[in-house]
């Protein structure tokens, strides 16, 4: 998710002030070590803030399997942090060095860490453009370096002389298993990385299309709690039930796939973001939504400028999203009860923030909590998107 410079400055200020709570999703490893539901909720909430500075998630498991067909490819995804983010393997450079990258549907470009398995000096196809870049991901400290051009492939689909940021900073993760970020957002949205924009260097999917590797700039993302599938340049009909519904992509101006719908009857425009854990909107809009729900106690934090809800775990309300009136999706019980406080109370997977612009009173971000229930087809050269139940 990207915003204007003005909006980002305010958000980065909040993020920088909140560094006492680590944004590093290596702390999701702490989920396995017995971190409380309250701490986990705060970590995930801080990631929502970090998304507005292009936040990502470290901690990576095993490799991915690839199925390549003419005109496209399908890749198995690795679930990260208990189904809150998803990773894929990429091969970079003339030696095809393998780097594990997090899929980020809210960021257009790619980032490769200097301490990953990729070494520019060992790749005969590498070119250091000398063009500087800066990308703030987690604390606001930032990742900076130079933009490199080299071959990058996923699932056997190679983008030649692909532009990515090469950085010695690790403001996106201290986890050595994660070597980069692979942006998947649509082109043309607000872009505050001028080094890429000034030269017309686009993201991975658009580059594949421009170079004739795929016929259509598109991907299908099917996320699951224990993995998932990414299809590039094609659609895998086995990944969904029933029919794919074709809808107007109301998130295109934001670089997302998005649709109009309702959450428990309240109208919103939903922006799909694989890098966000739950649901996020502006402070006032989320507060009003929660106040309208029976049995919900508001939890407000002035320091972070955040609001969420606390409920009895045994009387958990339902979150039902209507997808443009075509079908309904109910968030799963494991998602709704993920933030168990251990005293019979649970925090809800929804966040409101004062630093989110007014447009996010109507535009709400929906992440993995919703996307785990659907299969989404995002088309770059169309004003439409497609979606179906898994």
From Swiss-Prot:
What cystine pairs are annotated? 313-346
Which residue positions does the secretion signal occupy? 1-20
- Main subcellular location of this protein, as a coarse class: secreted
Q: According to the record, what induces this protein's expression?
A: Expressed on human skin of healthy people and patients afflicted by atopic dermatitis or seborrheic dermatitis.
Q: Name the residues annotated as catalytic in the UniProt entry.
A: 104, 273
Q: Which UniProt keywords apply?
A: Disulfide bond, Glycoprotein, Secreted, Signal
Give the propeptide positions.
21-69
- One cellular-component annotation, GO: extracellular region
| Carbohydrate attachment residues | 62
Q: What does this protein do?
A: Probable inactive secreted aspartyl protease. May promote an inflammatory immune response in the host when the host skin barrier is breached. Has no detectable protease activity in vitro on fluorogenic substrates, a peptide library, or with the general protease substrate casein. The presence of the enzyme also does not affect the activity of the secreted aspartyl protease SAP1.
Family as reported in the entry's similarity comment: Belongs to the peptidase A1 family.
Recorded hits in PANTHER family, A to Z, give: BETA-SITE APP-CLEAVING ENZYME, ISOFORM A-RELATED
- Which protein are we looking at? Probable inactive secreted aspartyl protease
């Amino acid at each position: 998710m990207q915003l204007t410079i003005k909006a980002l400055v305010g958000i980065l200020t909040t993020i920088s002030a909140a560094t006492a709570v680590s944004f590093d999703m290596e702390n999701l490893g702490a989920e396995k070590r017995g971190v409380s539901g309250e701490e986990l909720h705060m970590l995930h909430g801080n990631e929502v803030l970090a998304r507005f500075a292009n936040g990502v998630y470290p901690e990576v498991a095993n490799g991915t399997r690839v199925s390549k067909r003419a005109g496209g490819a399908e890749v198995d995804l690795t679930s990260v942090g208990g189904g809150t983010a998803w990773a894929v393997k990429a091969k970079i450079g003339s030696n095809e060095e393998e780097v594990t990258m997090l899929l980020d549907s809210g960021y257009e470009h790619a980032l490769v860490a200097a301490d990953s398995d990729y070494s520019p000096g060992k790749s005969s196809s590498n070119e250091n453009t000398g063009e500087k870049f800066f990308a703030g991901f987690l604390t606001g400290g930032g990742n900076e370096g130079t933009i490199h051009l080299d071959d990058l492939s996923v699932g056997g689909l190679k983008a030649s002389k692909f532009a990515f940021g090469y950085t010695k900073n690790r403001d996106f993760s201290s986890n050595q298993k994660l070597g980069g970020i692979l942006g998947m957002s649509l082109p043309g949205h607000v872009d505050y990385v001028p080094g890429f924009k000034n030269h017309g260097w686009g993201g991975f999917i658009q580059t594949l299309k421009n170079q004739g590797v795929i016929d259509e700039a598109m991907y299908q993302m099917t996320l699951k709690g224990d993995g998932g599938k990414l299809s590039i340049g094609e659609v895998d009909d086995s990944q969904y039930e029933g029919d794919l519904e074709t809808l107007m992509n109301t998130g295109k101006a934001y670089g997302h796939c998005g649709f109009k719908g309702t959450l428990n009857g309240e109208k919103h425009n939903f922006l799909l973001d694989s890098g966000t854990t739950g649901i996020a909107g502006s402070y006032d809009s989320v507060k009003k939504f929660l106040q309208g729900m029976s049995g919900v106690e508001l939890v407000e934090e002035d320091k972070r400028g955040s609001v969420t809800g606390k409920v009895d775990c045994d009387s958990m309300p339902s979150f039902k999203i209507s997808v443009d009136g075509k079908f309904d999706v109910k968030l799963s019980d494991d998602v709704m009860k993920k933030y168990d406080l251990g005293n019979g109370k649970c925090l809800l997977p929804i966040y409101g923030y004062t630093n989110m612009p007014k447009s996010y009173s109507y535009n709400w971000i929906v992440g993995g909590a919703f996307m785990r229930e659907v299969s989404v087809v995002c088309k770059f050269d169309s004003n439409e998107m497609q979606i179906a139940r898994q």
